Amino acid sequence: EIMPSLVGSEMCIRDRVKGDRRMAAFVHPRLGGKVLTANGYTTESYKPPLVNPYDVTTADQLMTRLPGEDLYSGMTPAQRAAQKLMEEYATLNDATTRREEWMAVQAIVTGTIPIVGEGVNEVIDFGFTNKITLSGENKWGGTKADILGNLGDWTDKVLTGGFANVDMAILGKEAKKKFFADANVQKMMDNRRMNMGEINPRDLPNGVKFLGHLTDPNLDLYAYGEVYYDDWTNPEEPATKPLIPDNAVILISSHPNYMMAYGACTYIEQASGLWVTSQTSRLLRSYVEHHPDRRMVELQAHP
């Protein structure tokens, strides 16, 4: 689970430190120690975008049966209003959570988060250098494909340049098909003289599927079937897309040092009419407007 970092201002500040593989020096006992020079770091700041879904409830919606309500329940408009309020809060929270998950996946897969919406078109760039693209017959499924060799090389590359032990691989839909269909993978898995791993797919909660385990490199294999509705890339033709691109392979650690930062939420407090700043990951509000009478339910977040 990624713990949230709640910021008390609208700006989030990030310090980026690049590690290395230096070792402590040998010294003579009478000469004393040798300084291990500290690495530098870069500080970056960013104003997180506003995520602000809302819903509107009017009087006529409360006079008729809600979806799923018994035909003869006898619920009053006031009771329907209370139930609808809870359902609206849950809907807005789910939509915001999906947006946060999409942001996290974009950061992991591409190293960038495109912020595209009404009045905003920006990119958060984490400066990733650990992206590899296979081409031609070297692509998985090609005549020169070396799937197990690729996974071993990429694991070593992360260990050397990223200073982390990756122990999980997440395969996109097409990458998973190519992995299972690869003759070398099938041959190694069928070798009874060597334990190179086990393929034993099973479903896990929330769209996750465990595929199996490799012993060299030491990787647990997973697939993730979650999708999202993209209505901003091409508004004329919105489409449902997989969170994990079909041809992607993600190598990741099961113990990552990740952080989810949130900027502060500022709003006008209805009772006092004053501006208020709240240090929170979610700001849920409900207020009334007239002409016509309606209740506004909104969620504000700055992930």
Locations of regions flagged by a protein language model:
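Long, contiguous amphipathic alpha-helices that act as assembly "spine/axial" helices in icosahedral shell
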Residues: P49-K131, D146, N150-A175, E289-A301
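A surface/extracellular/periplasmic glyco- and lipid-processing/surface-interacting theme
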Residues: G136-G149
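Short acidic (Asp/Glu) and glycine-rich catalytic loops that position anionic groups and cofactors
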Residues: K131-T133, W275-V276
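Single conserved hydrophobic/aromatic residue that forms the stacking wall/gate
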Residues: E1-G8, I13
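N-terminal low-complexity, intrinsically disordered segments
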Residues: V17-P53
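Sequence/fold signature of self-assembling virion shell proteins
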Residues: Q186-P303
